[in-house]
Structure formats: structure tokens, C-alpha cells
């Protein structure tokens, strides 16, 4: 991937969109994971360039930990927020999430309750992001990549909801490529705070942080995102998966892709052509 070209395209597109629509801030949920770190870096450059031409713009990052948030990931979110964002805030939503969750229903399995609470946390974060967007005259920027979009790794009305996303059609393995490119830039710039933040983000295994399951790759059973992306590309292109890939991993990826197809086709509506008016 030509990281320089991809980065420049993303920055220029965002600059044009935000300026032409008179939007003066980007609101970003900063988790400490690779996706939000990469999006933060993209918008740091957008902010820098827009402000240099006299257009007031800022990237506002917010970390919203709960009791299930990985301590390392939260620590990294602080590194990213303080070194890359123009403004950074922390809001613990633990008690808020617990206060609005319906008590365990009789006969309901424990894993169902974990999913419910996890979804509440994700949707609460989105409520706060959109509230901040209103307060600061901005919009919410997303962190969804193509791999996780196809596999359904998002909560409907939660992290799957946003107004603008520069990495939606980047494979997860490409997000890592871009992060390493950013790392090289900051090493050359001797901005060691950003080097530290980006390198730490690259090193932490992706996970939702909702208290539902282990890391994403462990859940899939895949060794790395190159494997996952290659399988998904084969599915989309209707071509054979490389023979050296484990059959269980292939089945796991394809099963997640098929089972989450409904998320990629929402909302379901009835067209006017179906009615006899």
C-alpha cells in the first residue's frame, strides 16, 4: 500500500468536507486501540492544515473507560489523547452504564447479560460523543475498518454509528501499515511522545473492551489480520482461499461474515412500490 498517497487522500478529503460544510471540530472516541489512534493522527494533520490557512478547527478526543476497560488500553488512550488530539477529555461511564441496564431476566444465560451490558456501554459512549459534537459544533468521526465492518465487530447504535470515517474501506492489516508509516514520520520528527503513543497502540491486541469476550483474533482463532483479510478477500472475490490456511480459521471467518450480514444491510424498510395506495 502506498501509505503516503493514502494518507494524503484522507487528509485532503477530510479538509474539503469539513470546510465546505462549515464544520469546526471532529469528535473522536479514543480507546487506545490501533483504529482510533490512526484516525486521531489523520485528524491531527487535518487540524494542522486547516488552522494554518485560517480555518478554525480542532480534534477533540474523549476516552470513556469502564470497569472492564483494559488498563493498558486506557493508559495508551491517555498517551494518544495528550500527544495527538488538540483537546482530550476522560469520562468514566461505569456507574452510568450499570444504572440503566435492566436487571438479569429469569432464565437468561450469563453471556446474554454480558452482551447487553457491553452494548449499553458502547451506546452510552456514542450518546456522549454526539452530545459533545453538538456542544462544540462538530461531528462524530468513526474508527470502523473494512475487516471489522465485514465481520460485524461493532454495536448497532454504538461504535457502528458515526458521521465521517476515513478508514472504513481499509483492511485491518492496512490500518497497521498506516500506523507504522505514522511512526516513521514521528521518529524522523523526533516527537517521542507521539512515537511512544503510536508504538504502544500498535503493540496492544485489538479488543472491544466491553467485558464480553477476549481479544478479537483469539475469538476468531486466527494468527493475524493478514490471514483474516486474505480469507475475506477470497470470499468477496469468490476465489479459493490459500491452501496453507487452517480450515477451522477459514470456517470461523466465513461464519462471522455470514452471520453478521444483517448489520451491513440496516435499516430494513418497506419501499413505496410494495404498497397498494
Feature roles, as predicted:
Residues 33:
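Conserved G/P- and acidic residue-centered "switch" motifs that form tight phosphate/ATP-binding loops
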Amino acid at each position: 500500500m502506498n501509505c503516503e498517497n493514502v494518507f494524503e487522500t484522507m487528509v485532503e478529503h477530510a479538509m474539503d468536507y469539513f470546510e465546505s460544510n462549515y464544520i469546526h471540530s471532529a469528535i473522536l472516541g479514543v480507546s487506545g486501540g490501533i483504529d482510533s489512534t490512526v484516525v486521531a493522527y489523520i485528524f491531527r494533520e487535518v487540524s494542522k492544515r486547516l488552522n494554518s490557512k485560517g480555518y478554525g478547527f480542532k480534534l477533540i478526543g474523549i476516552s470513556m473507560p469502564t470497569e472492564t476497560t483494559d488498563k493498558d488500553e486506557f493508559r495508551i488512550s491517555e498517551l494518544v489523547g495528550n500527544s495527538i488530539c488538540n483537546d482530550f477529555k476522560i469520562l468514566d461511564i461505569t456507574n452510568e452504564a450499570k444504572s440503566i441496564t435492566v436487571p438479569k431476566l429469569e432464565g437468561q444465560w450469563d453471556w446474554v447479560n454480558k452482551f447487553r451490558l457491553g452494548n449499553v456501554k458502547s451506546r452510552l459512549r456514542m450518546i456522549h460523543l454526539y452530545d459533545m459534537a453538538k456542544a462544540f459544533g462538530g461531528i462524530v468521526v468513526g474508527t470502523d475498518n473494512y475487516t471489522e465492518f465485514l465481520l460485524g465487530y461493532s454495536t448497532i447504535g454504538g461504535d457502528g454509528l458515526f458521521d465521517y470515517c476515513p478508514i472504513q474501506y481499509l483492511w485491518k492489516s492496512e490500518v497497521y501499515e498506516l500506523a507504522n508509516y505514522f511512526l516513521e514520520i514521528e521518529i524522523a520528527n523526533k516527537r517521542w511522545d507521539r512515537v511512544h503513543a503510536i508504538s504502544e497502540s500498535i503493540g496492544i491486541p485489538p479488543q472491544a473492551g466491553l467485558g464480553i469476550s477476549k481479544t478479537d483474533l483469539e475469538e476468531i482463532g486466527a494468527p493475524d489480520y493478514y490471514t483474516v483479510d486474505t480469507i475475506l478477500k477470497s470470499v468477496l472475490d469468490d476465489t479459493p482461499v490459500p491452501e496453507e490456511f487452517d480450515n477451522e480459521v477459514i470456517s470461523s471467518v466465513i461464519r462471522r461474515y455470514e452471520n453478521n450480514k444483517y448489520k451491513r444491510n440496516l435499516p430494513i424498510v418497506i419501499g413505496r412500490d410494495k404498497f397498494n395506495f
